[in-house]
Amino acid sequence: MSEFLTHPFEPFFDKDSKILILGSFPSVKSRQDGFYYQHPRNRFWPILETLFDVRLENITEQQAFLRKKHIALWDVLQSCKIKNSDDKTISYAKANDLSPILSQTKIQAIFTTGQSAYKFFIKFHPRLKAVRGILKRTCNYP
């Protein structure tokens, strides 16, 4: 059964963030743990670990890594109706306002983590379409 949810945690960024990576909406596991991409099947952290040759054992290490690399994380959606963690079930979507994070940082590129995030990004933030570096797919579950 789908339930209407509001995003449970804040965006992760600091004033030196240069890259913004946007997901669609947190998974059940991420909502439980209070941080982004915590579902064990999500490829987000393994991809970053491989790209940067690091091992990130916990949320504290993930956050330190993101700060060091000037990466900000947030989700396109502020609230939606969703069943479990299935992006295909999202309805009644309401977007996060990206202007606070964009005005407080040095964001130079915005990436999305999958098809749903990209679709909602384009729908809700059409004026940002020209921002370089929009990636359509990176972290879909098998």
Segments from the language model and where they lie:
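Short, surface-exposed acidic-centric catalytic microdomains
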Residues: K29-I90
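Short secondary-structure boundary/capping segments within folded domains
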Residues: E10-D14, Q63-F65
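Hydrophobic/aromatic beta-strand patches that form the interior of the parallel beta-sheet core
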Residues: L20, A72-W74, F111, C139
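Short, hydrophobic/glycine-enriched beta-strand segments
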Residues: K18-S24
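Short loop/turn segments at strand-loop or loop-helix junctions that form parts
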Residues: S24, V76-Q78, P142
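Structured helix-beta-strand junction loops
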Residues: K15-D16, K69, Q104-T105
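Glycine/proline-rich loop-helix segments at beta-alpha junctions forming the active-site rim
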Residues: S2-T6, P11, C80-P142
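Catalytic metal-binding/acid-base residues of hydrolase active sites
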Residues: F25-P26, E57, S116-A117
